[in-house]
């Protein structure tokens, strides 16, 4: 049907969305098979937003990482605000203009895991009239909990916004451990609970 319009799911860490051979983590979310196997999920478009490899920590953190959490001396993070703005002001309008989307808030979804989850939470709070559904997996707000919690308190979500929040009990990896000596699994759990 050439008149049909579709909801759109925008996903952070686009390299991980479709194929494992492209995934920076070595395995993908395999979104297409999951959509095919679950007939309850409506047809939709998926926009997989890649990060810039080595710049992921900078792109996916709205604030500099908390020095108390970093055992390194370099400045890390702080470009997430510009990245969120780029998605809302450039990517989404381009997709809505060139494809048959349902551009309304209720049919515009945003999801991500770890730092992608942080960016999903941040973007949802910053632009409450743009995305109506947020999928936040393994929220990594621990990179600067103080700034995150203060920001979220000052920028509440719209009451109609739907949030799916998920965290496991085996979170984190060697990359996370490179930034802190704390229990990374507990840090992810706390981030999700405090949100």
List where the protein language model places each region.
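Non-catalytic cap/lid and distal C-terminal segments of serine-dependent acyl enzymes
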Residues: 1-195
